Amino acid sequence: MNLLSSLRLSLTIVSAGALLLAGGADLAAAQPPDVAKDTGQVLASPREYTLVHRMPGPDFKPTAAYQWLEVLLEASGRDAERHRPRPTILSRTMAVVLTSMYDAWAAYDDVAVGTRLAGRLRRPARQRTQSNKETAIAYAAYRSLVFVYPEDAEWIRNRLRAKGFDPDDGSTELTTPQGVGNTAANAVIEYRRHDGANQLGDEPGGNGEPYSDTTGYAPKNTPDKVVDPIRWMPIPFSDGNGGTVSPGFLTPHWGKAKPFALERADQFRPPPPPQWGSEALSRDIQEVVRLNANLSLEQKTIVEFMREGPHSTGQSGHWLQFAQDVSRRDHHTLDQDVKLFFAVGNVVMDAFIACWEAKRTYDTSRPYWWARMVFKGKEIDAWGGPGKGMIKIGGERWRPYSPDVFLTPPFPGYTSGHATASGAASRILELFTGSDRYGAVAIQQAGYMTEPDFSTAEMQARNGRPANDVAESKEVRLFLPTFTATAEIAAMSRLLGGYHIRTDNDEGLILGRRIANYSWPKYRAYFAGTAK
């Protein structure tokens, strides 16, 4: 069964690669005129989905770029476990590392230029060997990884040693690939040291802590007092030890961080969201509550697949994993992998910067509070919590499909970060490959984060009665036919989960795709050696 139909996403397929949301909002946006569009053949039968997400075949030989991306993803997951998932920060750290790798590689390409030193690192033709590329990439990855993840410096050193390199070789002698890699990384690091993200905690306005806010943001509302219902307010989580914690707005200053390809964070700022009391917002809130009460096993799986878990690499990491699928599918060379990962990593960083500028500008709340306000004192059908399925509750008790320790991401809703990042990354993948076709299948376990200890009958219970019409197996296969559809699914997962209203997602997808369309000629210019 086709994933889109099984999700009942209200999507109308108007061509092999272009999808429209119900209502007619064109999310594909305009295509750069110099890029030929080849939608390819969208897979129709489940048997045709032989590309399994995150499962390389026995004969697969990863390129050096693919291997270092694996190290980057693992380091990012370790950081998320240490600090909770921080999608803005993760997107930047990945872009820093992938840009360093690209710049080191470019020194050994015939035409490509780096982002910081242009063509000044170009090595003579006799030095442009595969081995030199791999060594330069390794040192660039190592230096930049230690910069962005200093708490894991020893672990990262061991990864470099395991690949046969000396982490104490800090040479910047350009006649050696070690020197090229170190020099390329040092230039990117210096450029990003004070880029508005406040990584070191020493930028004006911060409190001295890494990545601390530099803008003095304070929420209009508190968990105990609503001053303005449209505005964001912290949500109390379980701390896992019997108490509660109400995290503040994660990196509210992120719109001030320096983007890669965008001129300004507000360059494509979306229009204002629907306001409190409007028919549009009322409709969006009712939709969230209705969907929450009727989640299928497949829909729950989609929520968790796109959310990832405690070891999350964020949407940047997730889309880089999709890019790895493409690498395996298309039998990429090292050169292709370096360029693809560089483009995906940077467009997602820019997407988060633009998204956070919108979040800070509009400062909107989340369904967690809005549903409770609108349906307070009313009995509604809703998800009752792990293993309870659908039950009737007072509207003031409504909650998303999520564990108690992470009910909703701690930042405003408009626009959705998942949707914005997915819109950008999916479009770059389409432009890079020349086709919207993806053709992957993700094999997941339903409820593995939220309801791991319950049977499918308990998960799908209704009013206290276990379901008798669901399969015993929790295995769900999610079919991802196109990059566009995968982005739509990522956005829809936030509505199904109860973290966002539809408007957050629709405008996020549009924003992300505008960013990608604007950025693509810049990436191509770096590849072609014509970047200024």
Annotate each PLM feature.
Residues P32-K532:
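Acidic/polar surface patches and capping/hinge elements
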Residues L11-V14, A18, D152, D381:
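Short, flexible helical or helix-coil boundary motifs
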Residues S6, L19-L20, P412, G498:
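Generic secretory/membrane-interface signal
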Residues A18-L27:
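C-terminal segment of classical bacterial N-terminal signal peptides
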Residues N2-V14:
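Bacterial N-terminal signal peptides that target proteins for export
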